[in-house]
A protein has these predicted regions:
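Alpha-helical structural signal in soluble globular domains
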Residues: 23, 79, 83, 121-126
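Non-cysteine beta-strand/loop elements that form the S-adenosyl-L-methionine
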Residues: 32, 86-95
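Glycine-rich, proline-tolerant flexible connector loops at the mouths of alpha/beta enzymes
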Residues: 36-41, 92-112
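Alpha-helix-loop-beta-strand connector modules within alpha/beta enzyme cores
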Residues: 51-62, 106-132
């Protein structure tokens, strides 16, 4: 059995993950709370701290990406690859009203044709591992 630490925005920051890893090294993967994929490729201060390799040392950390734009997803995934990540996670589960009303997270599930095109594009254009929540 594999044990994964789920991402919870505002809870499982790098500080929480690091403390948990140091006290209980029982997780196979530590998912980082979502990063909003943007055209400008600039990570926020919180996002930079969360994805910093120094803040995730020793653990298999997986950044989560929130978007419904395939090109933004691919740009963000490529930038995360430069940080040394081998895998990213697509957030299709966030039920937050502010996320869903923008058609992201669980809101993307209401657009099956658009989602299928999105998934076809991202899986065909990157060699990174992609998991979906």
């Amino acid at each position: 059995m594999k044990l994964y630490l789920a991402p919870l925005e505002g809870i499982t920051s790098y500080i929480y993950r690091k403390a948990l890893y140091q006290c209980f090294d029982g997780f196979d993967k530590y998912f980082i709370p979502f990063i909003r994929a943007k055209q400008n490729l600039n990570f926020s201060g919180r996002e930079k701290k969360d994805i910093s390799p120094e803040n995730n040392s020793g653990m298999y950390a997986v950044p989560q990406i929130l978007t419904r734009n395939a090109d933004d997803f691919l740009r963000t995934a490529n930038q995360l690859k430069e940080y040394g990540y081998q895998e990213v996670n697509l957030n299709l589960g966030c039920p937050s009203k502010t996320v869903v009303t923008k058609g992201c997270g669980a809101g993307f599930l209401a657009r099956p044709e658009e989602l299928e095109q999105f998934l076809d594009r991202i899986f065909s254009k990157t060699d990174m591992k992609i998991s979906v929540k």
